[in-house]
From Swiss-Prot:
It is found in: Endomembrane system. Required for receptor inhibition of inappropriately expressed a-factor receptor (STE3) in MAT a cells. Inhibits signaling by relocalizing the G protein beta-gamma (STE4-STE18) subunit to intracellular membranes. May also be a mechanism for the down-regulation of the mating pheromone response after the zygotic fusion event, promoting the transition of the new diploid cell to vegetative growth. It comes from Saccharomyces cerevisiae (strain YJM789). This is Protein ASG7. The modification Phosphoserine is found at S121, S123, S125. Induction: Induced by alpha-pheromone. Repressed by the ALPHA2-MCM1 repressor. The modification Phosphothreonine is found at T153.
Amino acid sequence: MTTLASSIEHKTKHLAAPFENDENTWMKKYCCQCKSCKMSVPVQPWLPRFFVFGILCPVFWLVNLLAWWFLQYWQPHELEFHDLQEDEYPGFYEYEAITKRTVIPLKEEVLQEIRVMQNFSDSNSEEYYESKDGMPSSFLNVNTEQVEDENDTLKKYRYAFLKKVAHDVLESHDLLRKTFRNWNLRSLLGLLIDSILIIFVVLLCKKSR
């Protein structure tokens, strides 16, 4: 397994344990839950097809434009986030998976959060084990400060997870709208070119008479 330190040195954004990919909530991609996005997702693959069909029959370009207007503007399109259940939040298991260098792709800002938390956790662990030999066994069994530190670390870890979810939702929303905009601007351009050609042909026919 690769370590986070070596990952930082090589400037990689991946850590490693493919067998945990399905279980780790960090691997899940969260999408916008607004009505516009939900209705647009199944239509998205048809945009380039309708554009190509429009070369033979411009009506398909009109269909693209109408779908763009109806799905992206008529429908509610304010950002809506996934309603996370309690069991979807990362717990100590996922936190341990990160500290043990399970490899998952993370955003740079999330990596920064994890590095800060890891340094904080490592420093506390060193202090704890240095003083361990001089402590009575009763104190070793229950260490309130360590539990509080772990809870604090988990809260920060969950906060980083929420930032990741927010980033995913915003990215999916913007990407979907950008895709619709690009293909439908092409459709609009195709209609304009066809209109200009029709007008040009009509004028030529009138002059030839």
